[in-house]
Amino acid sequence: MACFPIFIDIKQKKCLIVGGGKVALRKVETLLRYGACVHVVAEQICEDICKQLPSAQRRTGHVTETDIEKSVLVIAATSSRETNHRIAELCHSRNIPVNVIDAPEECTFIFPAVVQKGDVSIGINTGGKSLSLIHI
């Protein structure tokens, strides 16, 4: 996927993660570092996510269209390919940026490798190839 490099301000913006496991945890941590208002919806939410988010920002159960519509971006990080695909379709039809952890072809954005030195941030995308280049 050829991606346009862009940095966006997500401070205090609602970012939805659907899924409550280790992959979701990594995305929670990343978004929180940039000041996002992270919400998690999942059938089960790991303890580490529960420690990082107040109860008002996490819910056990199934994601709803309203959850998606109120978000500025969505990450589909469930263990169900079908669920992730359904989330992607809902986001696509509403022009909401979506990252699907198990289907790059359904993503409208990716998480680049990030190098941060003070106020300088560099995002690196290798298109899934030459991952050793990230360590420059």
Give the location of each predicted region.
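Hydrophobic, well-ordered beta-alpha structural blocks that scaffold small-molecule cofactor pockets
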Residues: 1-44, 49
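Short loop/edge segments at beta-strand edges and connector loops
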Residues: 42, 59-62, 102
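Short basic, glycine-rich beta-strand/loop surfaces that mediate nucleic-acid
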Residues: 72-79, 109-129
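Residue-level detector of alpha-helix initiation sites
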Residues: 22-23, 82, 128
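Conserved small/polar residues in nucleotide/adenosyl-binding loops
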Residues: 134-136
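ADP-ribose/adenylate-binding Rossmann-like module
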Residues: 73-77, 85-109
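Glycine-rich, highly charged phosphate/nucleotide-binding loops
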Residues: 54-66
